[in-house]
């Protein structure tokens, strides 16, 4: 699927929902301007918040032949470029930012989604067989199965036999859920309903792994299960969300190749609203073809 097709899907879905298509915001001159500490000649004595935009835009190459080329390269990517060297070693500010980003990534893995946040969204909360974060990280197999209490809750409180069941799970990034929820779930649910699909009761699974959607689909009798789950964070990017969609999942027979994945959903990647439109189109095609993953015809 190329960019033109994605844009057409977004326009179609948003139009059917009666909403305007979001336009990309062009960076202003002020935003594009090189911050004080981004100058190649500025020393590392200036105190910056290592997580700020200024720190990310900092250029550490001293006495560059073409400073304008470095500035343009620095603006074009979030990768660690133009950081400079002190002999064979990274410069102090570059190293400190690396350590800060690493710390931020570890924090988002270890953080919990607050129960108050789940209640504020009006979501039913269930758990996998995991009881705490440490067990979640060391026993991924238990994160693939619902607890007995969760199974009872789904059977008693959720719509049975829906066309599409949407599930939200913390996964390996709490920030991915809390940062993107408002911009992806409401338009996703609205788009699915606008398409005439019977949508199940959305709910939140704490300590869930991807394969848990197979058991959910089997219990609820869902034709398509859509799991929105936090991705393992990378350095400097802790808010990336993934969508795993599968048709008619079964615990015993569904394999990873049966899933269709849309990853890198966040403001710096695939915008959540755009991802919602693509997921709606994907669910419709899965129901039409009665397939998902590598079994779908393109």
Swiss-Prot record:
It catalyses: ethanolamine = acetaldehyde + NH4(+). GO terms for molecular function: cobalamin binding; ethanolamine ammonia-lyase activity. Signal peptide: none annotated. Coiled coil: none annotated. Its main location: other. Binds between the large and small subunits. One of its GO terms (biological process) is ethanolamine catabolic process. Adenosylcob(III)alamin binds at residues 210, 231, 261. Residues 17-37 are annotated as: Disordered. Pfam families: EutC (PF05985). It is found in: Bacterial microcompartment. Pathway: Amine and polyamine degradation; ethanolamine degradation. Its EC number is 4.3.1.7. Its cofactor is adenosylcob(III)alamin. It is an enzyme of class 4 (lyase). Transmembrane segments: none annotated. Keywords: Bacterial microcompartment, Cobalamin, Cobalt, Lyase. One of its GO terms (cellular component) is ethanolamine degradation polyhedral organelle. The keyword Thylakoid does not apply. The basic unit is a heterodimer which dimerizes to form tetramers. The heterotetramers trimerize; 6 large subunits form a core ring with 6 small subunits projecting outwards. Belongs to the EutC family. Catalyzes the deamination of various vicinal amino-alcohols to oxo compounds. Allows this organism to utilize ethanolamine as the sole source of nitrogen and carbon in the presence of external vitamin B12. This is Ethanolamine ammonia-lyase small subunit. It comes from Salmonella paratyphi A (strain AKU_12601). The lineage of its organism: Bacteria, Pseudomonadati, Pseudomonadota, Gammaproteobacteria, Enterobacterales.
């Amino acid at each position: 699927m190329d960019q033109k097709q994605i844009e057409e899907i977004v326009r179609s879905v948003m139009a059917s929902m009666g909403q305007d298509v979001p336009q990309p915001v062009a960076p202003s001159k002020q935003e594009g301007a090189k911050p004080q500490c981004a100058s190649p000649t500025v020393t590392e004595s200036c105190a910056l918040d290592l997580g700020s935009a200024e720190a990310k835009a900092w250029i550490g190459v001293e006495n560059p032949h073409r400073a304008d080329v470095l500035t343009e390269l620095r603006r074009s990517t979030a990768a660690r470029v133009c950081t400079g060297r002190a002999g064979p070693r990274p410069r102090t500010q570059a190293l400190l930012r690396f350590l800060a980003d690493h710390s931020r990534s570890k924090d988002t893995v270890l953080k919990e989604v607050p129960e108050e946040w789940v209640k504020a969204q009006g979501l039913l909360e269930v758990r996998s067989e995991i009881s705490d974060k440490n067990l979640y990280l060391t026993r991924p197999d238990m994160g693939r199965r619902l607890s007995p209490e969760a199974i009872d809750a789904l059977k008693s409180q959720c719509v049975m036999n829906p066309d599409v069941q949407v599930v939200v799970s913390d996964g390996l990034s709490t920030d991915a859920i809390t940062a993107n929820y408002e911009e992806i779930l409401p338009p996703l649910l609205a788009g699915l309903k606008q398409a005439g699909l019977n949508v199940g009761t959305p709910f939140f699974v704490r300590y869930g792994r991807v394969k848990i959607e197979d058991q959910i689909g089997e219990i609820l009798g869902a034709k398509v299960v859509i799991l929105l789950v936090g991705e393992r964070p990378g350095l400097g990017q802790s808010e990336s969300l993934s969508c795993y969609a599968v048709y008619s999942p079964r615990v015993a027979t569904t394999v990873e190749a049966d899933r269709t994945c849309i990853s890198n959903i966040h403001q710096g990647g695939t915008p959540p609203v755009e991802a919602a439109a693509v997921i709606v189109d994907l669910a419709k095609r899965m129901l039409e073809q009665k397939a998902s993953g590598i079994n779908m015809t393109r």
